[in-house]
Amino acid sequence: MADFVFKISPNIILGSYSASRIGQFVQEWGTKFMVLLDPILHESGISAKIKQSLTDRNVDFFIFDEIPNAPDSKVVSQALKLAKEAHIHGIIAVGGPKTCSIGRVVASLYYEVLDLYTFLDGSTPTAGTLPLICVPTTMRDIFLFSDSTPLIDARSRQLKILKLQNNITKLSIFDPNLSVSLTDNQVSSVSLETLCMAVESYISQKSNFFSDTIAEKAMELIISSLDGA
């Protein structure tokens, strides 16, 4: 089956094994990247495929996979520091919402002079952003294309919403084969959450013919898969 490519901002690629061609896709934004990688992807072999694709295309990269279950501002500060020291051209985030969230913050604040906590306290970033390429392992990140992202403040352990610039994510690659890293219970949970998102999209006041068509098809496919589970 051919890939389904959306020519919008950000660009979206849907297709089996599309993640294995990430080395081809990212060359538009540079040749030196920081790869944020969910550590669980080492076990499923997904990380090896990502690294091989980048290597085959002569893309220079380094891996940051020190990502706990609930990453906070300390983890993000560490990732941001490494990114600045490496003078990268862009960021590739491969994993679930927590990994993509770190990627959004690092891409947003890469060119900022002020530190992360200044923005956690309410300031809005104004500098340019670093190109961000996301490879979500699930389709449930509601902040993926938004101008904000949740982050735990390590000082108070409170969850805060960090304001970001618009259009940080330049490309999102959705590869259904990446779901092999999920357990059966996780697949069921993600399916129900995705169904709720499709329903919310359908009844939204901002919906249109195109979004309704996608939402209807999504609900049909999800319900069908749940019936067969």
Where does each model-flagged region fall?
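ATP/NTP phosphate-donor binding region
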Residues: M1-G90
